[in-house]
A protein has these predicted regions:
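Catalytic-loop region of hydrolases
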Residues: 1-39
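Solvent-exposed loop/turn segments at secondary-structure junctions
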Residues: 20-21, 52-57, 107-111, 153-156, ...
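Short beta-strand element of the alpha/beta-hydrolase
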Residues: 28-31, 42-55, 59-68
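Loop/turn elements at helix/coil->beta-strand transitions in domains of secreted/extracellular proteins
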Residues: 43-46, 96-102, 142-145, 172-176
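Conserved alpha/beta-hydrolase
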Residues: 51, 67, 71-110
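Alpha-helix capping and helix-loop boundary segments enriched in small/acidic/polar residues
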Residues: 78-85, 114-122, 149-153
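Alpha/beta-hydrolase active-site loop
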Residues: 89, 96, 117-138
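Primarily recognizes the serine-hydrolase "nucleophile elbow" in alpha/beta-hydrolase
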Residues: 132-184
């Protein structure tokens, strides 16, 4: 894991999820675990975040932005790419206040496969499965309080996760939903 500004350990992890047709696929996410102990009531809260669209190539995945403000690189065909992690301030603000943050790449970004842009069922599955896997990786109870958040495409993904939580992931204890300008 990487230590970010002394306030969090971050690591990218793969997890299993399903397409809207029920086909198993792998996706990736980043877990930001605060280094300070939780001082609030109950279990440490977790925010499952889906970023806005940065592009459709694997190099555009949030987990490929590096563990900071972004990255510069080359695409598979050799053209230059910039992956700006413009939500980094949100992640660090949440972590500094003691929340765990899991940033979902969504299906087809950062892993083999085609990015299924704004497919609300697959976005919901990806966010809910990122929550389950991230909580397990953090050794946190599956019923820890979580909230969904996102911006642009991620705002729509967070709404979809809230909509499908009871039927797709009933063990997840959803406590809040926060979105910023869903795509539409």
């Amino acid at each position: 894991p990487h230590v970010l500004d002394g306030v969090a350990r971050a690591r990218v992890f793969p997890y299993d999820t399903t397409t809207d047709g029920g086909k198993p696929v792998q996706a990736s996410a980043t877990l930001y675990e605060p280094t300070a102990p939780w001082r609030g009531k109950g279990e440490r809260p977790t925010i499952i975040f889906a970023p806005g669209t940065r592009g459709a190539g694997d190099q555009c995945a949030p987990s490929h932005a590096g563990m900071g403000l972004g990255s510069v690189g080359l695409s598979k065909v050799g053209s230059p790419t910039i992956n700006a992690n413009y939500e980094y301030g949100f992640y660090m603000g949440a972590v500094q206040h003691g929340a765990r943050v899991i940033v979902a790449d969504l299906i087809g970004l950062g892993m083999p496969g085609h990015h299924t842009y704004v497919n609300h069922i697959e976005e919901a599955h990806a966010m809910l499965d990122a929550a389950r896997s991230g909580l397990e990786l953090a050794h946190a109870p599956q019923d820890s309080p979580i909230g969904f958040a996102g911006y642009s495409q991620g705002g729509g993904a967070s709404l979809a996760a809230a909509e499908f939580a009871d039927s797709y992931a009933p063990r997840i204890e959803r406590s809040r939903n926060l979105l910023r300008r869903p795509a539409g």
